[in-house]
Amino acid sequence: DYDGPALLANVSVSRMRTAESRMVERARISMAMDRQGGINRLEMDAIAGKGPITFRYMPDKPTMKMVLKIQAQDAGAALQAFGVYESVRGGQLSIKGESKAGGDQKIIRGKAELTNFRVVNAPVLARLVNALSLPGIVSLLSSNGIDFSRLESSFVWEKRKAVDMIHIDDGRTSGASMGLTFEGALDRMADTINVTGTIVPVSMVNSLIGNLPIVGDILTAGSGDAVFAATYSVKGSAKNPTTMVNPLAVLAPGFLRQIFFE
């Protein structure tokens, strides 16, 4: 009996629609699907914005794992093209993950890294910063944007017919203006978000606290490390979630060094 894939496809197009009013160029796609409509292999090479994007989801025969690899040289354009996130500009994206050997092939565990990018017109982040009464950073978000040097996170992605869930753990990002941690879940099927974390406004409040003779030494343990921070939560509809901020958190210097990849 034939037990091969139900569909094998190889496509090359000059322009490919990826989301509403979004395109990538010079796309080459190779795909294999099973008889239930599941994807056994998907390879894509294309141009998104100013750079190439590569996508690989395929079996690794020696380990019996499904392997996911995504690379984008213009991360912002790639994220916009596939309807993931609209507010990133530039940057380099790397995502690597794999399933358990002999385990559930629909669950991928891995890490994501985004470097040298800018965030502009991000309403949720603007709400968090606005709650901390930092108008300078809010103004940056709505104009030139805020530069971040690095973002990284662990993730577990479960993708089935009725489930499309991404669990995020140990997320952190930092730049000259702020650092953030984040963890939680994105339900792509229900289009909801449930994320909590810590936000550290570096350039303003922390420099002020560090310069206070007595309070500054107490809060920074005399090291000059900034420890003023706020905890936050973002929950509800991904398009218009509810945000909550507690601006009275104090962090140990070691935790701050972790946020800023030191």
Residue ranges and their predicted role:
Residues 239-262:
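Gram-negative outer-membrane assembly/targeting C-terminal domains
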Residues 3-23, 28-235:
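Small-residue helix/turn framework positions
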